[in-house]
Every structure is written in C-alpha cells, then in structure tokens.
Amino acid sequence: MARYPLSQLSVSLALCLAGTAVAGESPVNLPATTIQAKAAAEGESDLHTPSSSGSRLGLTALQTPASTSSLSGAQVRGRNNLSVQDAVTRTPGISSIGSPGNGGTALSARGFTGHSATMQLYDGTRQYVGAGTVTFPVDTWSVERVDVLRGPASVLYGEGATGAVINVVPKKPFTGAISNQLRFGYGSDDRRQAALDSGGSLSDALSYRLNLNQQASNGWVDDGESQSQALSAALRWDASDALSFTLSHDQGDQDPQRYLGTPLVAGQYRESLRESNYNVDNAEIRYNDQITRLVSDWRINDALSASNQLYYIKTQRYWRNAESYRWQPGDQVKRSDFYEIKHTQEQVGDRQTFTLEHALFGLDSRSVVGVDYNRIHFARQHDFASSFTDSVPLAGSGGGQYQSTDPLGYGPRERNLARQFSLFAENRTQLTERLSLVSGVRRDQVHIDRSNLVDDSRKDRSLSGDNWRAGLVFEVTPELSLYGQYATSTEGVSNLLTLNPTQQQFDLSEAKQTEIGLKQAFWNGQGEWTLAAYHIVKEKLLSRATPTASTEQIGQQSSDGLEATLELALGQGWQVSANAAWVRAEYDDFTEAGGDRSGNRPTNVPRRTANLWLSKALSEQVQAGVGARYVDARYADTANNVTLPSYTVVDANIGWQVLADVRLGLELNNLFDRQYATTGSSDGQQWYLGAPRSLFVTADYRF
C-alpha cells in the first residue's frame, strides 16, 4: 500500500510555507461565514449551533426534535482523545466496543451495537460497511467538529442507523492570510507525533486546507508496535458569490497494534497478563483508506440553493493473526482461529440536494429534497476453512509463525456488488410563532449481487426500505424548547454489503422509536442542559421458535432510556461538562441454538454511562483539565453468564502558552492506571484491555 513519509513532508511544507506566512498570525480557524464555522473557530458549540447529523435543514439543537451532541475540534483534541471513538464516547450513552475485527471503531448506543446499528459518516458521506469493519478516519488531528444524533436515523441516511449516527466534519478551507500550525509530540512507550495544519487564501477566489499527521508507538503490550499516517487536503474555488467548488482528498494508512486480547484464567482476569500478547511473531494488520470528493454549492436565488457531492472511496484491509486464545490447565494458552483476510472495497456515489425556503398553506416553511446513489464493490480473500491450533505458555507472549490448514489456502473467496438508490425529503414548517413541525421521508432500494469465487455460484437479492420521522418542537422561550418525535429505521440482518446467501433470504429488520425531551440555555448563555427519554422496539431479528428449529425472522429487541447533559461556565475560568445515560435493553423474543435468551440484556450494552470534564484557566497562559469516564458492567455473552466489570478512567492535561505562537502541553491518560476491559470475545473468555497510564508531551508552533 502507498505510504506517505509525513514527518519529512510536514517539515518540508512548513519551511516552504514560512516564506509566505505572516509571523504571529492568529490560529488556523474557519471563516465565520456560517454559524457552524463561527462555533468551531471559537472552540465551542452550544444549543444554538446547527448540527450536521440531526438534519439537512440547517437546524440548531434547540430546533431539532431529537437528542444531539456537537463537539468542536478544539474540544475533541483538548480532552486527550486520540480517535473519533474516544471523543464520541464522552457524549451521552455511547460506549466503545472496538476490536481489530471491526477496525477498532464499533460503538454501542441506546442498547444497539456494532456497525449495523451505529452509523459513522465522513462529512455527511456514508462508507458502506464491509464485513462489519470501518477503519476511517484515522485520528482527530484533521477534525473540525463531530456531530452525534442518537436514535433511529434511516430517514436521513438509509438503513443501518438504529442506535446513533456520528458525523465527522473535517477542517475546511478558509479565506484570509495563510496560517500554519506545527505540532511535535513524544510520550510513553516511545509514542511520537509530527503534524501540520495549514490553510488560507491563495488568491481572491482560491483557498485551501492541508492537514498531515504521522504517529507511531512501541505499544503497551509485547510486540505492540503501531504507526499511522493521515492526509487531509482541500482546495476551494469561489467561482462567484453564489457558486463554489471544493475538491478534497483524505487518506489514512494504518498499522495498528497487533493485539487480539487477553485470555481469562479459569474464568478470572489475571492482572499479571496485562502486557502479554499471544499473537504470532509475523502477525500483520494494515488498513488503507482513501476518500476523494468534489462538492458543489450553488445559491440559485434567495429562496433556492443546490448542493452536490460526488465521491470515490477506496479501502484495503489486511489481517494475518492467531485470533482466539483459551486458557488450558497447566497454564497453557490454546490458540485457534488462525486467519489471513483481505478486504478490497471501492465505492462511487453521488448525492444531490435542493433546499427551498417557501410558504406552505401560508406558513413559513423550509424543505430539502434529494437523491442518493452508490455503487459498491467488495472482494474478500481468506482461509476460513483453516482448523490449525497450537499452544503456548501462559507466562510470556505468544510467538511462533502463522500457519493455516485451509485446503484451498489463502485466496479469493467472494465478490459482492451493491447498487443503492434513494429519494428523500425533509421539511420544517412553523405552525405557530412557537410551534414547529419537523418531518422527513425516505425510500431506499438496494440490489445485492454476490459471487462465490470457489464454486462459481451467484446469488442476488433486492431489498427496499421506507422510513419516516415526525417531530414537534415547542419554543417555550427563545432559550427553552420541548420536543417529541416518532422515527423509524431499517437494518439488514447483517451488513448489507456482505450478506451471505442464507442471510439474503430475509427482509430488513425494522425499528421504531418514540422520544420526548427538553433543551434549555440559561445564565445568559453560560449554562445549558438537556434531557431525553426514549423507547425503541426492533423487530424481525433472526431467531428460532425452539433451540433446535430453523432460523426465522421472528425475534424482537427493545430498549428504554434516559439521557441528560449539563454544560456550565462557572466564572473564574471554570468550565464543567457532564452527562449521564441509563438504558434498559433486552431481548423480548430471541432464541438461538444455545437456548432461549428472551429477557436477557444484549451483549456489550452497559446499563449506565457517565462522563465529566472540568477545565480551569489557572492564568491567562495556563489551562488545566481533568475528566472521568464511567461505563457500567456489560454482559459478554447472550446467555448473560459472563460479565465485563464496570470501569472509571480518569484523564488530565495542562497547557502553557509560553509565547504568542508557542504552546506546550502535557496529557495524562488513565491517570490512576486502571485495568479494565472495553469488550470481549470467545463468549467472554477473552478480553480486550484498555491502555494503561501514559503521558504525552506536545509542542505547538503557529506561524
């Protein structure tokens, strides 16, 4: 795969740009041409900030009949978040269940888990999920903001969005003098970083943004080396005051830590194994993602505007590992699931929308109508028929070479083609001075064509989904709104792109949600709080009438929950950000080969989560922050026999503005060195551990 020597490139570009930059320029910020840009530039977001995930109507959080969260890039990077997943799990009710098999990016939200239920977008564009895996974006350096919509969102983004939608908005070109930021960092486990952020005007009509980031580490487990490179580049041409074009290319190249988890010993976690890595010596994990987009924005007249996004996405992923570890008497570890896997995925798509300000029955109204088309190719190579196993000592770390007993060896196994087409519309109508109706409809059609490259067989299926949403927002005061909504969503019984022939026989699962809530800003904008309550029912799950019966689409799962947030600026430099969530999720009707699981809680779903972040300006030059993340106990198996313990992890940081253009920072992660598991596999007998205590020192220079 292509590599970018980003550390060398960062320095070279910085030297080239230094000649044209103005010394002492202000930090790289988006222009305040929209509310979104202003909020991001100030490093804050509030209930008056439009959310890119909650609607395409440009509504603020107060105007949206749904539970949303917005994090500016400054907030994301200012809270020790290395990944987008780290950032969004500091918002209400979302927890990480990442593992190498899902790209380290899977989430749990509102009682529903994995990439089939929690959708992740990049600047509003969806990369279809292949075999349960998403590997982009790489890090948070190029992130301008992250918007979260909780609850069903198929009416906005199509099937597969029952739990939540996360939209990552990258940094955008801006007008004005060229401004640059260089960062160098070093910390525990030989972790190092070199990064560049540059942007500004090249002429009256041309502006750009360029972000480069290279990171590497020796890792906190044996043989845990990792490295990543990320590139985000965009060029904007303002053809006129009403017409603009933006061409962008984003790329990530990763060699993540080759750690597949830690086995329990006689059903118990042994702390002495924290740094052990039982993978083979020649294990490999590599991800390469590329996204190229052309965005056109046209203000046709005062009432009508159009936007088009044409995009090409390419992904290559490769794994070669011993994936499963089981403790054996005599303190041996049996290794199995020796698999070599490659994904090659290409996606071409286009989304066209029109936004119209108009009157509807004499009432002020705004509508968005659009069409979405995607063509996705997915090919997979593997050796899943391998049954090779071996044993290694519990003391120490793995070792040995990868071996496979697949009779066909490692090679091409399947090729899939999916064509997706959708029509969608949204509307907001001001019914009275205080009451507004927000509604939406969407029709999706997907045709899936799967080719088995071993026996040359072929299977295809067409699926369709109709979804809608309706919500009322009552503005009690300009700073307080009450809302209620009803929304639906659809999901494949697994990821649509890689449904096997048996799974293709089934229809889409269906979910419906009712939600009520309130949102309020107070103390002249120095504080805000939100509260949401919801009920979700998902039907047509794969289940059995009895443990020995054949699989049918007769299962049901539900969840009820509460979510609350609080943001306060207390004066004297104190800032408080807190949230908490509670969910009661269960299988209403679910039987599998192992037994009836009705009444059980789904795996990887914590009943309670909470987050707190406190920051204090110690002086004009020094700021400090400390935060805690709490995740309740979760079940690691559908029988609810194995429990992953709850955990609380504390992080802290301090920043010192040494000079006008030089800033030093210190990040402390897992301050109290808590040992904890984020998720499990092998029926809960193998835990994926969180990283131990670490520190990281940064130096930022702006010019």
PLM region descriptions:
Residues 34-75:
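N-terminal periplasmic "start-of-domain" segments of outer-membrane beta-barrel proteins
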Residues 70-73, 87-90, 107-150:
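Periplasmic plug
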Residues 129, 142-144, 155-231, 239-243, ...:
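Outer-membrane beta-barrel translocator/receptor signature
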Residues 238-240, 345, 364-366, 372-374, ...:
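Structural signature of Gram-negative outer-membrane beta-barrels, strongest in the C-terminal barrel
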Residues 290-315, 336-451:
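Face-selective signature of the C-terminal outer-membrane beta-barrel domain
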Residues 295-323, 475, 481-485, 508-591, ...:
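Membrane-embedded beta-barrel scaffold of Gram-negative outer-membrane proteins
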Residues 526, 535-537, 553-639, 672-675, ...:
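Gram-negative outer-membrane beta-barrel transporters
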Residues 630-637, 656-703:
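C-terminal beta-signal and adjacent terminal beta-strands/loops
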